[in-house]
């Protein structure tokens, strides 16, 4: 696992803690019951049910390790004390993309919370990384997988 910080909002941390609790309590119990039920059916060497349950167990344990690692490296973003002078993780940024009339508003979050469809972009994404440290009215050129974009920062919250 990585040693770099995992930037999370307070809500993001709470969601991960709730997911971890669910996986450790209910998830493990349900899979253990499925494994035991498959064993009771007899020969497990050719049991698809047993193999499926063991695969799900491995997936669940991997997710538990991943969440524990993220929480251990968590650095909480204080969204309420943000600066409107410079883009940072936790900032809500409104931009205009050159050649378009509409404005886009994104919140810069850590990679574990990124959901572009909800307007949350990672600080590690090309756009998120290019916006960090910039100020209102600055123009930014970003190389993305779909080509070069030119953005003008209109507002930072």
UniProtKB/Swiss-Prot annotation:
Write out the entry's keywords from A to Z: Coiled coil, DNA-binding, Transcription, Transcription regulation
Q: Which terms does the record give in the GO molecular function aspect?
A: DNA binding; RNA polymerase binding
Can the keyword Endoplasmic reticulum be found in this entry's annotation? no
One GO biological-process annotation of the entry reads:
regulation of DNA-templated transcription elongation
Spell out the InterPro entries in the cross-references.
Answer: GreA/GreB_C_sf, Tscrpt_elong_fac_GreA, Tscrpt_elong_fac_GreA/B, Tscrpt_elong_fac_GreA/B_C, Tscrpt_elong_fac_GreA/B_fam, Tscrpt_elong_fac_GreA/B_N, Tscrpt_elong_fac_GreA/B_N_sf
**Where on the tree of life does the source sit, at the highest rank?**
Bacteria
Please provide an example of a Pfam family that matches this protein in its UniProt record: GreA_GreB
Report the coiled-coil segments: 13-75
The family database entries (NCBIfam families) matched by this protein are listed as: greA (TIGR01462), PRK00226.1-4 (NF001263)
Q: Briefly, what is this protein's role? A: Necessary for efficient RNA polymerase transcription elongation past template-encoded arresting sites. The arresting sites in DNA have the property of trapping a certain fraction of elongating RNA polymerases that pass through, resulting in locked ternary complexes. Cleavage of the nascent transcript by cleavage factors such as GreA or GreB allows the resumption of elongation from the new 3'terminus. GreA releases sequences of 2 to 3 nucleotides.
The family classification in the record reads: Belongs to the GreA/GreB family.
Q: What is this protein called?
A: Transcription elongation factor GreA
Look up and give the organism this protein is from: Roseiflexus castenholzii (strain DSM 13941 / HLO8)
Q: What is the lineage of its organism?
A: Bacteria, Bacillati, Chloroflexota, Chloroflexia, Chloroflexales
């Amino acid at each position: 696992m990585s040693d770099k910080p995992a930037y999370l909002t307070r809500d993001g941390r709470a969601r991960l803690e709730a997911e971890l609790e669910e996986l450790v309590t209910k998830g493990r119990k349900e899979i253990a019951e499925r494994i035991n039920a498959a064993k009771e059916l007899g020969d497990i060497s050719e049991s698809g049910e047993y193999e499926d349950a063991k695969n799900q167990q491995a997936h669940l344990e991997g997710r538990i390790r991943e969440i524990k690692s993220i929480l251990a490296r968590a650095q909480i973003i204080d969204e309420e004390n943000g600066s409107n002078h410079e883009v940072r993780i936790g900032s809500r940024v409104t931009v205009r993309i050159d050649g378009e009339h509409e404005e886009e508003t994104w919140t810069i979050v850590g990679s574990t919370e990124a959901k572009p469809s909800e307007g949350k972009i990672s600080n590690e994404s090309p756009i998120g990384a290019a916006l960090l440290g910039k100020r209102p009215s600055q123009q930014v050129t970003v190389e993305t997988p779909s080509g070069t974009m030119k953005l003008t920062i209109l507002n930072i919250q």
